[in-house]
Amino acid sequence: MAIEFGSRRETFENYKVYETMLAGRPFKVEMGKMCGLSNASALIRYGETCVMCNVVMSPKPREGVDFFPLNVEYEEKLYAAGRIPGSFMRREGRPGERAILTSRVVDRPMRPLFPKEMRNDVCITMTVMSLDPDCSPEIAGMIGASLVTAVSDIPWNGPIGGVQVGLVDGEIVLNPTQEQRKVSDLALTVAATMDKIVMIEAGANEVDEDTMLNAIKAAHVEIKKIIEFINRIVAERGKPKIDFQVVGLDMDVFHAIQNKYLDDFKAAMDTDDKNVRDAALLPIMDKIAEEYPDLTAADLDLVSYKMQKFVVRRWLLDEGKRVDGRGINEIRPLAAEVGLLPRVHGSGMFTRGQTPVSYTHLRAHETELHL
């Protein structure tokens, strides 16, 4: 006898499926069924690939940090490919190289669109629950991460979209299948907003510039369709963005410091010796610390960074020179030498300006080969 615990509509009042096509394959978004305590959640279905995407934010800003604490996690589960972990304990291992790189690919286009002044912890998680080799879980995860962040109440200037582009027999292919990727002369990932390209990652086999440009343009056309799809969902389910607490340097104070000490910073930084430059900046920062006792150590570090950045930028744009006096087309003095160490197979040192890098080379014995 079948037992009915209630219809889906009764159990999940806000459950809804949104559908579109992505590169000729069905793309579905399920919302309102899972992870109700997160700021936003969605199950992304691209072909038979399923990726659970969630975003959460801490209610209060983290103290003692001078950066936006964003954490992007792309998690691969072996069960998604029908496999069981091979370890003795049958547990999932640490993230692989592909998972780490995918987390970075998603992080890069999303991070700049968050408010720089926000200090609340934000965690975006993408969990691959089912894998279809022909439907990229990385792209599904990127779109899902963008979608849930846009729908959530977390301040963010998105959304973004992303696609992969291949080149098979001279033809541009969006989100190529597994077989197409094997013979493709181009492995390109593009992320963009509605107006601008924000991230490109590419590997290619001698692809000319015109072909690469056409591939990027084709990607952006498809991405615009994705963003329109996301915007329709946001218009229906989007939450009002919260007002976050600004923690850190008061910009009115910084502008006052900038107006008073700009010439001092220019004079201190006008040298090609980093040690001399750092020593000249110390008394200036001591004066600022005495004049503004309410500034924390983190605030003072930020003042120093922002002032130096402003001076370097103005020199580049207004005078065409760099901080060490070099022109835009000049490079630092280079030096290289080899044979520094007697008991290794190879060694050397490469120096550029005041930055030396040493290196060693060893050839392992045949008995130490990885089988």
Residue ranges of predicted features:
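Short, Gly/Pro- and small/polar-rich lid/capping loops
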Residues: 2-36, 316-340
